Amino acid sequence: MAKIISIPDVHGSHKWEIVKSIPQDNYDYIVFHGDYFDSWENDWPDQGENFKAICNFVREDTEHRKLLIGNHDFSYLSVTKYGHSVSGHQHNHSTEIKNLLKQNLDIIDLAFECDGWIFSHAGFSKTWVKFIKDIFHSMLDNFTDEEFNIDFLNQQWHKLNHSNKEDNFCYSFHKLLDWNGFLSSSGNEVTQGPLWIRPDSLLSDAYYQKQVVGHTELCLFEKVYLHQNQNQIIFIDSKTHEIFDFINTSEEYNFMTIPEFNNWYKKTLKIINDIKAQLIYHNDEENFVKESLNHHFSKEIAEKIYKFGFM
C-alpha cells in the first residue's frame, strides 16, 4: 500500500508548492506528471525559475519524489524534423527551456510504477507499446518482450543522446514520443504515445490496466475515475491544474464509464454555471453559493466544489 500525491500539468503554476508543507511521513511518493512550461498566465522568466525550484525539491529526495516528462517539455528536446514545433508555445525561449531540461534529464523519467499502478503524463496504449518494442527488437541486442517494463523503458530513455539526430536509436525513440497521430487533431488515437494519447483511445487500448495520468483537463473538483472493460484510469488534471487528494494504491475507487462521466459532467457543470449566473442577485454571495451547492450535492462534494470553483 502506498499514498501518492500526483501533481498534474504545472504549466508555470506555483500550486505545486503546497506539497512542500506536507510532512514526509504523510505520503510515500510525490509524482510530477510533466508539462512544466508553456503557461498562458505566468510569463518568463518565472516559468524557468519555477521549474528550477521543482527540480531542487525533487533532488532533495529522488527516492520518493518523481519527475516525469510531458509533451510540452519534450517538444523542446525532440531531435526530429517536426517534433519541436508541435507543442512548443515559447519559441523565443526555446533555447533556455531546452537547456534547463537537459540540465535535469538525470531526474526526468517517462513513467513511474507503484503497486501495479503506472504513472505517466498521458498513458500507455497497447499499440504504442508494440511500436516501441519493435524499435527495441531492431536496435537492441537480444531484447525480448519479457524485458519490457517501466524500469527498462526509463533506462533506455536515459541512455538517449537528446542532441544527436544522427543517432538512429535516439531519432526513432523521439519520433515515437512525438505527435504520432493520423486522424485526430487532439491526440485521440491509439497510435499516440505516453505524452499525447487522450482518454477515449487510452481506455479502449490500455497496455497497463491501472494507470494515473494528466494531460487532459477532465477534472472539475476531484480526480476522475474511468473504466472500460478491465482498464481503470485515474485522471488528475483540471483547467486550473489543482492538486487533489492522495491516491491510495490499496483503495477501491468507484469508476465510471465514459458515457456515465459525460452525463455527470454536463449535469454538474450546468448546476455550477447556474449558481454563478445568479450571484449578481445576492448580496451574501458566499452563503447563497454554499446553500445552493448543499441543495444539489453531499456536504463533502459541496465543499470541494466551493473550494475549487468559487474561491
Protein language model features and the residues they cover:
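Catalytic phosphate/metal-binding cores of nucleic-acid and nucleotide-processing enzymes, i.e., regions
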Residues: 37-41, 67, 193, 197-210, ...
